[in-house]
Amino acid sequence: MRKFSKSHKLDHVCYDIRGPVLEKASEMESAGTKILKLNIGNPAPFNFSAPDEIIHDMIYTLRDAEGYSDSKGIFSARKSIMQYSQLKNLPNVGINDIYTGNGVSELITMSMQGLLDNGDEILVPAPDYPLWTAAVTLAGGNAVHYICDEQNEWNPDIDDIKKKITDRTKGIVIINPNNPTGALYSEEILKEIVEVARSHQLIIFSDEIYDRLVMDSLSRSGYSVHYL
């Protein structure tokens, strides 16, 4: 009988917080240890529910939601994103620059599939949110990890980034505020990364999904590469 094996593209696809780490936590939980499962963004078990007005709006518009929307996403949603960008003073964000999807994970995967040929490289922070490495690998590319130094408050090592750029490098991923380290990069650090990207003509993928979850004092506000 013919045996089917998984694709070698999965060799470097790991998601330990939903795999080995979760299995160990479940084992400890079974033995009586109380476990707080903060490994995934699952708000419902912690009683964070969607606001009632959003639930009501979803019910009200359900009939109108049948069928396909514009390939870039629902116009009203894209307009709201544009207005939000304007409130944050982000320059040059027009309605036609905005694409929406079923969560950022889908859009990351689509971006890598559309950009990378076999052997192309994307610079990814280490440690990283594992989706980035997985998406690059599944698209046939190579995730080249640059160091985020624990001894330097988990900031990116700019010299390490420069050393790892090759003729096959197409882009660099910035996760700020960072997942999983929680580091918030300074304007100076971001400017250095932007200058490296400019000089080598690299695309910057700026993952800022946690930009409103900064718990430090207001004096330590987050910076976005979009301002630079």
Predicted segments with their positions:
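N-terminal small-domain helix-loop-helix segment of the aminotransferase-like
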Residues: 2-6, 11-103, 110
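Aromatic/hydrophobic pocket-lining residues that form π-stacking "cages" and hydrophobic walls in ligand
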Residues: 21, 25, 132, 193, ...
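Helix C-cap/helix->beta junction micro-motif
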Residues: 31, 139, 199-200
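Short acidic capping loops at alpha-helix termini that bridge into adjacent secondary structure
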Residues: 92-98, 118-121, 168
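Conserved PLP-anchoring active-site segment centered on the Schiff-base-forming lysine
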Residues: 114-136
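A short helix-loop-beta submotif of the ANL/AMP-binding
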Residues: 138-144
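Active-site phosphate-binding strand-loop segment of PLP-dependent enzymes
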Residues: 144, 149-220
